[in-house]
A protein has these predicted regions:
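N-terminal metal-binding scaffold of metallo-dependent hydrolase/deaminase domains
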Residues: 1-42
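Metal-associated gating/positioning segment near the N- to mid-region
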Residues: 44, 50-135
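Active-site mouth loops of central-metabolism enzymes
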Residues: 62-75, 153-166, 185, 212
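Short, acidic/polar
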Residues: 73-81, 162-173, 218-226
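Alpha-helix-loop-beta-strand connector modules within alpha/beta enzyme cores
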Residues: 111-117, 130-152, 199-209
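Active-site core of metal-dependent hydrolases
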Residues: 120, 176-299, 316
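His/Asp/Glu-enriched, well-ordered alpha-helical/loop segment
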Residues: 277-356
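C-terminal cap of metal-dependent C-N hydrolases
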Residues: 348-401
Length: 414
């Protein structure tokens, strides 16, 4: 599909921007992979008629765990990324490659598959050193630059903090495209955490914490004190992955930290609703971003992003169009990346949504608020239609149609 593409008959146009989440326009022109015009209807080689359905920026999953290619070893599942894209997600942010078999084993005592592997003769300490975690982060970054199942954008450049890093490691990581340092498992000393934090800031790496029920360093018992020392840019799964931090640490992050507050599908949804309400009271909804924390021990849920939006709409007064911003524009901005918005000049990563066929509702926003399922009928990434029609079991009410206009004949030709 080359040349300009015009989306027309858009019923509801969502922008991904909290300042004006719904745009007063019925058309969007895409060319060269980029949104060129909004609200105009010029001639275009390809016209996509939405028949009144909703057009929105593709969702960003701010907390995904990519492995190699589209295989998830913990679930022994192929195709999780492709199914995630078909469910309306166009961008994945890696929260770290934490579960590569044999490459990063958190603990021989944890009651999970990694402990099982350690029990069979593996040495978990061996995979837990600065050299190994750095090599893995660089390898994943390289691999996901070219591996794009269904065209997905996957930012895989996340490295775990480990004991033993020196400043040159950070220089090397930054030069190799690593964009985020994540405190995942406790490192030994809080002084090292503070040093890593300053190197990350110096070299332009974002800092994310595994925000849960354990301290980030071994020499500090208080979860809150370790969070204070690390001063994260992003408090990863502040509602737990799966168990949240104590409420006083969560409230400290909201009231005194400056971090983006990430809420994930697999966490504690009551705590997520609490964070959302507090952020709304503080007029700080721009700090909230949404993710899945999948695939992982909890399973593979390709529709997790929409489901999280829906559940949070039931548990709070925040309208669906604002929750969509937390899964699109907010995330792009927090990660300092382009996209997540329906705006001129932004990448054309777009999804056409409509209520499931049998729903009593007739509009995507009403459908999600009501509690029915909505489905994408068309998904575009970088101006390329990667899915049309619905390969999932159920269909949206209004399926977009694609019309190709014959190219204009050159003057003088017959
Ligand atoms: Zn995670």
């Amino acid at each position: 599909m080359n040349g300009p593409i015009l989306f027309r008959n858009i019923g509801t146009l969502l922008s991904g921007d909290l300042a004006h989440p719904m745009l007063d326009a019925t058309s969007v022109l895409v060319d060269g992979g980029v949104i060129r015009e909004i609200g105009t209807e010029p001639d275009a080689e390809t016209v996509i008629d939405l028949h009144g359905a909703t057009l929105a920026p593709g969702f960003w999953d701010s907390h995904f765990h990519p492995y190699f290619g589209d295989y998830s070893p913990r679930q022994r599942v192929n195709g999780a990324v492709e199914r995630t894209v078909v469910s309306g997600v166009t961008t994945l942010i890696s929260a770290g490659a934490g579960h590569q078999p044999g490459m990063y084993l958190p603990s021989p005592t944890l009651p999970n598959v990694q402990a099982g592997s350690a029990g069979h003769g593996g040495d978990p300490r061996r995979a837990r050193d600065a050299r190994g975690t750095k090599a893995l982060a660089i390898t994943m970054t390289e691999a996901w630059r070219t591996e794009r199942p269904s065209g997905v954008k996957c930012y895989a450049g996340t490295v775990f903090a480990e004991d033993g890093f020196v400043r040159d490691d950070f220089v090397d990581l930054a030069a190799n495209g690593i964009r985020m340092l994540k405190f995942q498992r406790p490192i030994s000393r809080i002084a090292d955490a503070e040093t890593y934090r300053s190197w990350a800031a110096e070299l332009g790496l974002l800092v994310m914490t595994h925000t849960g029920n354990r301290s980030m360093t071994k020499d500090v018992a208080s979860i809150r004190d370790s969070l204070r020392a690390i001063d994260p840019d992003i408090a990863g799964h502040v509602n737990g992955g799966p168990t949240p931090a104590p409420r006083e640490a969560v409230d400290w992050l909201i009231d005194h930290g400056r971090a983006a507050l990430e809420l994930v599908f697999i966490g504690n949804l009551r705590v997520a609703a609490h964070v959302l309400r507090r952020a709304a009271e503080r007029d700080e909804l721009h700090r909230v971003i949404l993710g899945s924390d999948l695939p992982g021990g909890t399973g593979v849920v390709p529709g997790a992003m929409l489901r999280t939006i829906q559940l949070l709409s039931h548990l709070s007064d925040v309208p669906v169009e604002l929750l969509v911003c937390m899964a699109t524009g907010n995330t792009a901005r927090v990660h300092r990346l382009p996209g997540g918005l329906v705006a001129v000049g932004e990448p054309a990563d777009l999804v056409a949504w409509d209520p499931v066929e049998a729903s009593e509702t007739d509009d995507f926003l009403d459908c999600v608020a009501y509690g029915d399922r909505a489905y994408p009928g068309l998904i575009m990434i970088d101006g390329v239609v990667v899915h049309h029609g619905n390969p999932l079991l159920l269909s949206p009410k209004r399926m977009p149609t694609i019309h190709r206009n014959a190219p204009a004949l050159a003057a003088g030709s017959v």
